[in-house]
């Protein structure tokens, strides 16, 4: 068979395989065209599930007479003229394939009139070459498209259509999605001459709620939590169901990117992660969510049906969505009564002996059973591992190396270790930058201060030298060489001929305490959160927030009042940046309200609160932790013995070998 150019109708029929899957696909393309034309009212008439008739009528801007012929041609559109336009696309359609593809598999008539025209014109294509014929018609300003006998000339496609009721159900669901995306557009749907849906345009809040209830049901509205988050040009808003409003199936899950319906895997995964600790595996969240992003930062030309997009900063978008969902659920949940627990902790700290550095380890690291907040191992791992802001989404399975959709079972799988096998040069460099609280001149002057023994670190200035990649402490004293890790929580050290065992979990605590105690030298540097965090607090605490402004500022914590029961966390210091700020900040404010503590008491209280997962340390992690301790404390680490470090006596083992 020789190579030849396909006839126009055959080429369009082949292309229609991607664009026109079923009657609902036709409705989608035509209704989106009406919205792009600025229509505020769209009427849809369906007969026999769309196989007999699909009629879309709108009051949009219409199509001029001299453009009607082009409208039915392939790759003809008024929405883009260059690649730059595609990269900044804001319209729902842009390929110019819909009308040509639909007309090739049906009997299509396009009737339209613009404001500038005195009469309307109808266009239809016929014949092998799809020649377009025009004739005058009576029609108001706007456009009407009649699609008759869908797939009449492609029997193979027609036989795959389902029953009329099934096909109409798909159309009904599609229009629900569109009705939610454009609340300002009136949409009427008829089937076989009977009015089935009437979605009136909504402007006020009661009207919007009424439309939401009409689409999703009153039960969704009853359990809906409004969510809104903004960061630069990235905006996120909508409604999500509380855990009490969860459903047995995922039938109310609507997501939009710049007004475009989406079924994107990355977005779905972020939403699932946000609900992971709130819903059991057999329940589904209900949500209506809108993402607004700079068109230059998203590629919509990925999927033929435009159901998927590609974000230029996928990780940022994923975590942004996760943060918004998780934060809204935390605010919507009723907070447990923790006042009594905090009061008892405060009394214990006030009675603590001044000569004692620390109470037993179990009093400093809170055990899981002491808190009443719901937890998730993956969420805690996520909080620990994020370098950007609290509540960052888990990293273990979202990146689409293969099929991201497979991550739906992620909540039942064991959590992957979130530590790297070894500290990278970049990690060490970042750590160096984060912990440096003095400039070079200050460090040079500080290094000249005579060394002296300190009886209590928090009451005297402590020399701070930025950590270096080499394992040398600020006083030239090291803990020794890390040989191995024992039982995942202890490091075996060699100091000369002496072997020692280091408690790695207690070492983490000592590191955090040292970082917080540097506030006695100068205020901790606030680090702005990538996305400001909204936190719910008691109204009385919010009213007295100004009383703690100076203390919070010295700790590098920047809070702003949002309303009477909510504050915005703008920045926190590095030591607490990786904690669950949704819980830590309200607890801190309650503690300040209870006893009006001193700065030193707050430092010790914060050291109590900071939690760590039951981590299985690797040798590389142990080496890095030892290095950090040496830079923070130097020879002052002696003050934390023997809870931190114990000598190992191998004399008996040597003697046992000698007697064999």
Swiss-Prot record:
Compositional bias (Low complexity): 406-417
NCBIfam families: mutl, PRK00095.1-1
Task performed by this protein: This protein is involved in the repair of mismatches in DNA. It is required for dam-dependent methyl-directed DNA mismatch repair. May act as a 'molecular matchmaker', a protein that promotes the formation of a stable complex between two or more DNA-binding proteins in an ATP-dependent manner without itself being part of a final effector complex.
Family annotation (PROSITE patterns): DNA_MISMATCH_REPAIR_1
InterPro entries with a match to the protein in the record: DNA_mismatch_repair_CS (IPR014762), DNA_mismatch_repair_MutL (IPR020667), DNA_mismatch_S5_2-like (IPR013507), HATPase_C_sf (IPR036890), MutL/Mlh/PMS (IPR002099), MutL/Mlh/Pms-like (IPR038973), MutL_C (IPR014790), MutL_C_dimsub (IPR042120)
GO aspect biological process, one term: mismatch repair
GN (gene name): mutL
Family to which this protein belongs: Belongs to the DNA mismatch repair MutL/HexB family.
Key words of the record: DNA damage, DNA repair
One Pfam family from the record: MutL_C
Organism: Aliivibrio fischeri (strain ATCC 700601 / ES114) (Vibrio fischeri)
Name of this protein: DNA mismatch repair protein MutL
GO CC annotation terms, alphabetical: mismatch repair complex
GO MF assignments: ATP binding; ATP hydrolysis activity; ATP-dependent DNA damage sensor activity; mismatched DNA binding
Highest taxon in the source lineage: Bacteria
Disordered, as annotated region: 368-426, 439-461
């Amino acid at each position: 068979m020789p190579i030849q150019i396909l006839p126009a109708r055959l080429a369009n029929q082949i292309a229609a395989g991607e664009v026109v899957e079923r009657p609902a696909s036709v409705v989608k393309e035509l209704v989106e065209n009406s919205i792009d034309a600025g229509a505020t009212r769209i009427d849809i008439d369906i007969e026999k599930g769309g196989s007999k008739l699909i009629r879309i009528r709108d009051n949009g801007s219409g199509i001029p007479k001299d453009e009607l012929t082009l409208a039915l041609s392939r790759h003809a559109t008024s929405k883009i003229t260059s690649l730059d336009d595609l990269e900044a696309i804001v319209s729902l359609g842009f390929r110019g394939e819909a009308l040509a593809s639909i007309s090739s598999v049906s009997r299509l008539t396009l009737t339209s009139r613009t404001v500038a025209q005195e009469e309307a014109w109808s266009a239809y294509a016929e014949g092998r070459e799809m020649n377009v014929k025009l004739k005058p018609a009576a029609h108001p300003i706007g456009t009407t498209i009649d699609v008759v006998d869908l797939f009449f000339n492609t029997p193979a496609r027609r036989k795959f259509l389902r029953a009329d009721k099934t096909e109409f159900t798909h159309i009904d669901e599609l229009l629900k999605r569109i009705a939610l995306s454009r609340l300002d557009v009136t949409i009427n749907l008829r089937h076989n001459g009977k009015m089935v849906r009437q979605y009136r345009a909504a402007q006020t809040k009661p009207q919007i709620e009424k439309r939401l209830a009409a689409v999703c049901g009153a039960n969704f509205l009853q359990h809906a939590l409004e969510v809104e988050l903004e960061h630069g040009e990235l905006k996120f808003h909508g409604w999500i169901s509380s855990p009490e409003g969860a459903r047995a199936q995922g039938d109310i899950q609507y997501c939009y990117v710049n007004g475009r319906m989406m079924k994107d895997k990355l977005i779905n995964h972020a939403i699932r992660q946000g609900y992971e600790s709130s819903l059991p595996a057999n329940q589904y969240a209900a949500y209506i969510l809108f993402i607004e992003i700079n068109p230059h930062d998203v590629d919509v030309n990925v999927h033929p049906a435009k159901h998927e997009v590609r974000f230029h900063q996928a990780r940022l978008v994923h975590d942004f969505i996760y943060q918004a969902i998780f934060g809204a659920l935390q605010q919507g949940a009723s907070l447990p009564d923790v006042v009594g627990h905090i009061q008892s902790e405060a009394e214990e700290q006030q009675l603590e002996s001044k000569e004692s550095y620390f109470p037993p380890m179990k009093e400093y690291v809170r055990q899981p059973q002491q808190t009443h907040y719901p937890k998730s191992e993956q969420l805690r791992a996520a909080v620990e591992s994020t370098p950007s802001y609290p509540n960052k989404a888990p990293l273990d399975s979202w990146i689409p190396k293969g099929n991201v959709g497979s991550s739906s079972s992620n909540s039942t799988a064991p959590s992957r270790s979130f530590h790297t096998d070894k500290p990278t040069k970049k990690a060490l460099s970042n750590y160096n930058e984060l912990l440096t609280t003095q400039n070079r001149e200050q460090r040079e002057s500080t290094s000249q201060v005579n060394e002296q023994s300190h009886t209590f670190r928090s009451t005297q200035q402590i020399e701070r030298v930025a950590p270096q990649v080499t394992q040398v402490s600020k006083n030239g004293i090291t803990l020794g060489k890390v040989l191995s890790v024992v039982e995942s929580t202890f490091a075996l050290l060699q100091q000369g001929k002496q072997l020692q065992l280091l408690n790695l979990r207690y070492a983490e605590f000592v590191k955090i305490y040292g970082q917080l105690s540097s506030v006695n030298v100068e205020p901790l540097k606030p680090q702005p959160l990538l996305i400001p965090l909204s936190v719910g607090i008691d109204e009385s605490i919010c009213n007295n927030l100004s009383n703690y402004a100076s203390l919070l500022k010295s700790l590098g914590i920047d809070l702003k009042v949002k309303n009477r029961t909510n504050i915005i966390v703008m920045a926190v210091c590095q030591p607490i940046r990786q904690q669950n700020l949704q819980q830590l900040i309200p607890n801190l404010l309650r503690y300040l309200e209870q006893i009006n503590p001193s700065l030193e008491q707050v430092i010790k209280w914060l050291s109590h609160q900071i939690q760590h997962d039951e981590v299985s340390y690797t040798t590389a992690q142990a080496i890095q932790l030892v290095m950090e301790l040496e830079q923070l404390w130097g020879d002052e680490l002696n003050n934390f013995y023997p809870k931190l470090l114990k000598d190992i006596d191998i004399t008996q083992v040597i003697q046992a070998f000698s007697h064999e």
